[in-house]
């Protein structure tokens, strides 16, 4: 029974990522939940539990928006200078936290005030975010060093660090809705801007460069993302090495 259900889910998931969804999100989530109840150790969950933390590409904005319609909605977020962390929850319980290099930080991350140990979600959900030192927003290298020191030390204080969640890994919502859903679950999300036209990007880039945008964070750039999950999946299909629907700007 579980193997047949697992095959169905993998088939639906494959078609979704190819841009041809066969069922809606609610139906898919129910199938995942049923599989988890029947067989929580299914290979499907093992494959999904590989928490990817790829570095963002640093291409030219012209290349990023090439081929997009002028009214394609974009999201601008701060590129927080800290350490990337991926969280995994099963039936609302935080079960795993890893660093970009794959280190298991679960027990340490549970000490961070901004990371809820329990959330109201059934089944599997994986979340990406940044661990950083917010009080040092004018000293970016210090923020990253503080986060890295916390991860390395056997026993270190966590009260000076924060966690900002900005992505549901392998999620099905657009970026704006993903951020709002993360907020609803109790996570701190980054300040962000929605662009209704691709030509608005330069205005926000200049604001950040002139220290008039995202000043509440230790930033070393800004991140531009496609809002549409459908467009994100199209770009993922042609480039699996990193999420080409998100790009870091560091100038």
Report the location of each language-model feature.
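RNA/tRNA-interacting regions in translation and RNA-turnover enzymes
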Residues: 1-251
């Amino acid at each position: 029974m579980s193997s047949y259900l697992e095959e169905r889910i993998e088939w639906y998931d494959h078609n979704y990522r190819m841009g041809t969804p066969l069922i809606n999100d609610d139906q898919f989530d129910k199938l995942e939940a049923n599989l988890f109840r029947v067989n929580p150790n299914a290979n499907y969950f093992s494959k999904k539990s590989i928490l990817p933390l790829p570095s963002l590409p640093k291409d030219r904005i012209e290349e990023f928006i090439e081929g997009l319609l002028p009214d394609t909605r974009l999201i601008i977020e701060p590129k927080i200078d800290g350490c990337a962390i991926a969280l995994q929850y099963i039936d609302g319980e935080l079960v795993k936290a890893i660093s970009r290099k794959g280190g298991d930080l679960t027990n340490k991350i549970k000490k961070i005030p901004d990371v809820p140990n329990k959330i109201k979600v059934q089944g599997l959900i994986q979340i990406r975010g940044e661990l950083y030192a917010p009080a040092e927003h004018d000293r970016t290298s210090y923020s990253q060093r503080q986060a890295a020191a916390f991860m390395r030390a056997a026993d270190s204080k966590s009260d000076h660090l924060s966690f900002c969640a900005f992505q549901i890994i392998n999620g099905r919502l657009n970026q704006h809705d993903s951020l709002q859903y993360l907020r609803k679950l109790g996570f701190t999300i980054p300040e962000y801007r929605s662009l209704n036209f691709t030509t608005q990007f330069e205005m926000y880039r200049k604001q950040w460069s002139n220290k008039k945008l995202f000043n509440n964070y230790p930033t070393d750039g800004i991140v531009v993302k496609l809002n549409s999950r459908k467009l994100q999946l199209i770009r993922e299909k042609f480039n699996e090495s990193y999420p080409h629907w998100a790009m870091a700007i560091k100038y």
